[in-house]
From Swiss-Prot:
Cited InterPro entries: Nudix_hydrolase, NUDIX_hydrolase-like_dom_sf, NUDIX_hydrolase_CS, NUDIX_hydrolase_dom, RppH
Source species: Shewanella sediminis (strain HAW-EB3)
GO molecular function, one term: mRNA 5'-diphosphatase activity
UniProt-listed Enzyme Commission number(s): 3.6.1.-
GO biological process, one term: mRNA catabolic process
Protein name: RNA pyrophosphohydrolase
Family recorded in the similarity comment: Belongs to the Nudix hydrolase family. RppH subfamily.
Cofactors required: a divalent metal cation
Gene: rppH
Length: 172
């Protein structure tokens, strides 16, 4: 679904483990890594889209995860001009995303990147919470920073809100 401003409705999914690490996945046949995400179909709620994408992209079902929280509002990013398909109608200039933070309840062996036969990802790993903000493609970085900051109190209740604050040296 593309809105009147040209943004496609989309859900983003951050899966965390009990150690506060997040699942980071490599796009199939590419060198870019990202969180699972996907479009919201006509008549589908964001939560329904999230569970559909969760299975399609990483093979997890609702019983494998627990929803911890979701973003208060939709977050947007614009696509670089080279990625905009001018021949499609309506033209999609970017994504508006509702993000979900999920806790993996099952064993990680439930993760199956080939669950649907047309994999979106070809590898995955657990990374530290703030790692994706520095590593994602530049046009998604601002959204990732906002999402991670909003989710930090839930995902990392006993750690500092920003990783770099704890690394700063003392002033003399």
């Amino acid at each position: 679904m593309i809105d009147s401003d040209g943004f496609r409705a989309n859900v983003g999914i951050i899966i965390c483990n009990r150690f506060g690490q997040v699942m980071w996945a490599r796009r199939f046949g590419q060198h870019s890594w990202q969180f699972p995400q996907g479009g919201v179909d006509e008549g589908e709620t964001p939560e329904e889209a999230m569970f559909r994408e969760l299975y399609e992209e990483v093979g997890l079902r609702p019983e494998h995860v627990q929803i911890l929280t979701s973003t208060r509002s939709w977050l947007r990013y614009r696509l670089p001009k080279r990625l905009i398909r001018q021949d499609s109608k309506p033209v999609c200039i970017g994504q508006k995303q509702k993000w979900f933070l999920l806790q993996l309840k099952s064993n990680e062996s439930a993760i199956d990147l080939n669950a649907c036969g047309h994999p979106e990802f070809d590898d995955w790993r657990w990374v530290s919470y703030w790692y994706p903000v520095r590593q994602v493609v530049s046009f998604k970085r601002d959204v990732y920073r906002k999402v991670m900051k909003e989710f930090a109190p839930t995902a990392l209740p006993f750690q500092t809100r920003e990783h770099h604050h704890s690394r700063r040296g003392r002033r003399r």
